[in-house]
């Protein structure tokens, strides 16, 4: 029987005035734009993780009731599976800025029709699938 490794992540599609929030990674981390979010720790549920990550990475405060699951991505490689849950929100509080400066150097709002070229491949894939109305995709 195979010994599959599975990881669970949660990411945020945060809207404000018709645009979505993206964080730009520092050069050592790729220099690309990505969504807020990360690993769901063993003591957390996905929305709790996203609330924590959003505050750590972008200085924003979210409430569980404002997070709606809109997409599930299943990624796999030779040795592992990764499930990523994407939540949408329109409400938030706080002082928005890239806070984990060793990982991110900017927080910016982008129109879904004018996304930056240097968006991570995974995030680009998910946003295309999400806009098509697809709740689930594989990569």
Language-model features: locations:
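Conserved N-terminal beta-strand and adjoining loop/helix that marks the start
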Residues: 1-21, 70-72
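Conserved Nudix-box catalytic region and its N-terminal flanking loop in Nudix hydrolases
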Residues: 16-56
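A short beta-turn/loop motif at secondary-structure boundaries
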Residues: 27, 75-79, 101-102
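Conserved beta-strand segments that form the floor/walls of ligand-binding pockets within enzyme
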Residues: 34, 68, 86
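A short coil-to-beta-strand element that immediately follows conserved catalytic motifs
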Residues: 61-71
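NUDIX/MutT-family hydrolases
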Residues: 98-131
């Amino acid at each position: 029987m195979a010994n599959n490794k599975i990881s669970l992540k949660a990411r945020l599609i945060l809207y404000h005035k018709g645009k979505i929030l993206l964080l730009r990674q520092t050069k050592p981390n790729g220099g690309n734009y990505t969504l807020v979010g990360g690993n769901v720790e063993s003591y957390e549920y996905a929305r709790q993780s996203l609330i924590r990550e959003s505050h750590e990475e972008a200085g924003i405060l979210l409430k569980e009731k404002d997070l709606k699951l809109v997409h599930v991505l299943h990624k796999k490689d030779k040795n592992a599976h990764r499930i990523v849950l994407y939540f949408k929100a329109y409400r938030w509080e706080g002082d928005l800025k890239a806070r984990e400066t060793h990982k991110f150097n900017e927080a910016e709002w982008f129109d879904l029709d004018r996304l930056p070229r240097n968006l991570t491949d995974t995030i680009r894939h998910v946003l295309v699938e999400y806009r098509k109305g697809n709740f689930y995709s594989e990569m």
